[in-house]
């Protein structure tokens, strides 16, 4: 139950800081929420990406809640769908997964928030194909082109380690798939079209999600 409660608190903290607080800060500083979600966001590759990410978000919230719900039913060993199948064992593996999960979730939240701040006025949720924003290449963006998404991936992995059940695993897989579609099929083509050679030069040296991996050929 402790692990599930920690995962629930971390999920709420991530949502409040990365979505609510960031939106409020952006609105206060720039007079704009930064959200670019429209009907066009639900067509083509963007629709696939957003659908996967929405499902991942729902499952990510459901995973610790499901673990909490069944934690009072010891007659169900391992839980429904493997909920807390690892956490219920008093083993070294459980201790390691708890520590790693907490570290990754906290680090993922921190990376996400820092990257959002470094984007400044260019920060967006969604994409308006008619809008041109400044290309941010400093800070975390000097080594990774999508550090916000890297942070989100770390957070999801941390949650899956904290509450190792099928819901958390599905959330991780769907979330990573959604980020891949969003970046490769939606954002990278837009940035190449908008910023051209400047984006290509930067993308040849900065990794896609991990430093040194996924750079574009110049």
Model-assigned labels for residue ranges:
Residues 112, 149-150:
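General alpha-helical segment detector with a strong preference for membrane-spanning helices
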Residues 126-149:
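Active-site-proximal inter-transmembrane loops
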Residues 151-158:
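Hydrophobic, membrane-inserted alpha-helices
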Residues 1-130, 134, 158-218:
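Membrane-anchoring alpha-helices and their flanking helix-loop junctions
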């Amino acid at each position: 139950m402790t692990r599930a409660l920690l995962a629930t608190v971390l999920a709420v903290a991530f949502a409040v800081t990365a979505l609510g607080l960031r939106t409020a800060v952006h609105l206060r500083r720039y007079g704009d929420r930064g959200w670019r979600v429209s009907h066009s966001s639900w067509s083509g590759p963007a629709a696939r990406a957003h659908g996967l990410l929405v499902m991942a978000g729902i499952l990510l919230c459901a995973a610790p809640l499901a673990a909490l719900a069944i934690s009072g039913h010891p007659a169900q060993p391992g839980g429904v769908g493997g909920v807390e199948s690892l956490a219920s064992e008093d083993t070294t593996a459980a201790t390691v997964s708890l520590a790693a999960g907490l570290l990754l979730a906290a680090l993922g939240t921190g990376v996400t928030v820092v990257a959002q701040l470094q984007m400044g006025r260019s920060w967006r949720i969604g994409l308006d194909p008619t809008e041109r924003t400044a290309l941010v290449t400093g800070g975390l963006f000097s080594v990774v082109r999508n550090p916000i998404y890297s942070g989100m991936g770390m957070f999801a992995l941390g949650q899956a380690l904290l509450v190792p059940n099928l819901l958390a695993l599905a959330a991780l897989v769907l979330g990573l798939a959604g980020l891949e579609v969003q970046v490769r099929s939606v954002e990278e083509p837009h940035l190449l079209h908008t910023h051209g050679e400047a984006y290509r030069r930067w993308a040849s040296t900065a990794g896609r999600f991990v430093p040194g991996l996924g750079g574009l050929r110049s």
